[in-house]
Amino acid sequence: MHKITRFDGLPSPWPEPKMLEPYFLGEKGRRWVFEKDTDQAALVAEGAEGTEHLGRNEGRVDIDFFLVGHPSIGVQLTHRRIKRGSGRNESFSSISNTAYLDRYYRDRYGSLIAIGLFIPFEDAWRAVKEFLETDGALPKSIEWIAGRDLPPDAFPDTSPLVQRNYLSRVVLEYRPGPS
């Protein structure tokens, strides 16, 4: 399995958990502060579940573990399992509070994400550590919602015409951390 890290400039393959821990369990106000101007990270597994010998469109299983964080609301996790060439994809999002699925965080790249999908840093850390320790399996330590069960407005379209309808519900926006 080929492991790729896209996490604040850390090298691939996946880092040891202790290298990621401060981003989740550091002192408040310093959590999720990156050297680079971003609020996102990813851990990728190409050829998971014993499929590393298969080609990209020959049934290889790839797993993407996306993270979007904000120091005051926590981390939103997405676990996506893609079986290449089969059209069989599964996507799950962390979820914390369904009452906040109609309020949004605007990330560094302008996308809107429902605040109810963000979980506390401590919970996100348990899930990230479990993901690393189980070679990319969907962590069982947090609650997930299947992508097909998400309300359509959980991740609104990023086009300006559509986002205009959501502007009054954006309660947090990305701000670069201290340099």
Language model features with spans:
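Acidic, proline/glycine-rich low-complexity IDRs
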Residues: 1-44, 81-179
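Amphipathic, interaction-prone secondary-structure segments
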Residues: 33-85
